[in-house]
Amino acid sequence: MPPAKTLREAYNTANPTEPLPPDDERYVNCTDVRGDEDTVSQMFRTISYSDAHTHQLFTGHRGCGKSTELLRLQQRLEGDGFYVVYFAVDEDLDPNDLIYTDLLLSIARRVVAQTSEDEINLGDALNVVEKWFAEVVYEEGEWEKVEQELKNEAEIGLGLPKGLPFIARVLTRLTGQIKTGDEVKKKIRQRLDNRIPQLISGLNDLLNRADVEVQRAGRKAVAVIVDNLDRVTYKDLGDGHTSHDALFIENGGQLCALRCHTIYTVPISMMYGLSARNLDGIFARCHVLPMIKSHRPRTQGGGEEPGGMDRLRDIIRRRIDADALCEPEAVEYFCRACGGHPRDLMTLVRQSIEYADDKEPRPVTLAAARRAEARLISAFSRMIPEPYYEKLVAVYQTNKIKKDADHQAMLFSQSVLEYANGTEPWHDVHPAVQKLKSFQEELNRSRVIEG
């Protein structure tokens, strides 16, 4: 795909939420400017070298490029003979209200649907799971009604493609009800919560049968990759207990009980405090995808990082003909204003196109770039509580964060970004946050006190 030469083309190719397919020409390898950790190769080797099933976590700020890297991992695993089930969890479930039983249901749905579409016969395991759901999830008389409704939908071609096993329709209905219905969601969760061992056993029966069938076809094993779990909303449930802890720590054992290789994305905020230590005891490995280093730590003299800035320019130029559409000053402004965050970089480019001046030979002007940045600054201003600014200034001055709930929340909201310098991570305040009036006032206040 050649770089876009019109504003319309540029607007669409700069879509900040679209992960790139593995062989997309727009892909820019940023491994060396993220800290020299090749996360895709590490996750691949963990799976391909291990005789036992592995359960790994993958994290990084939302929008840093995790989905693109996971799609590359999927391609590499499939090329090595693995059967990969990849899906984004928010396509099935609501990240604002998601618990581990919901996730297990979603994995079951995806495994059943994909194996059926690929003509991998799971045989009697499907019937056993279907019978179990009929007995456990539905009350007497409910199942017959649901069964008839789903059969009618299948006959007239509603919903899933024809030919999928009946249990695929059952699981699709259940995940859909959990995503959209409050009362029925509570009922389903209550009934499943009392039967977790049986739910996992049934899912493992499906995975065991899938393993047998894919190996019979000459492949190695099943691997499940669950993307976008890092979008699960952070909720303080009291007593230092959060929604993230509930999913990945308190019930992490259940997520690791599946008889297949698994990779789950996880919020980057969980890499600090007690959460990190607890995760290390549950999952085999947690891989971090840091920001692109657009600058050096302030504690080491600061200044731009030439390699990182070059790579950010490459990301823009692979997508759009910047020489034809952008003022050079605008391109530089985008790269500095994003803080090395790929999605924010694309967001700034796309929003600046909305402010482009058609009268100019290069319509994406520096003025348009500044207006786009103003929208990002405004978004942060509505998000950050006033008590956080003193702590944000401390992060700005030290390039370090504390391992407490407030700093975890800053990482989750991306008001603080994580970078890597070899094996040692460092942190900085997002450039847009640095321009907020409240931040500048607190920074000036701290300098007066120090002076």
Q: What do these predicted regions represent?
A:
Residues 54-55, 60-219:
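P-loop NTPase nucleotide-binding core
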Residues 2, 363-451:
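C-terminal leucine-rich, beta-strand-based interaction scaffolds used for sensing/assembly
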Residues 192, 204-328:
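The catalytic "switch" region of P-loop NTPases
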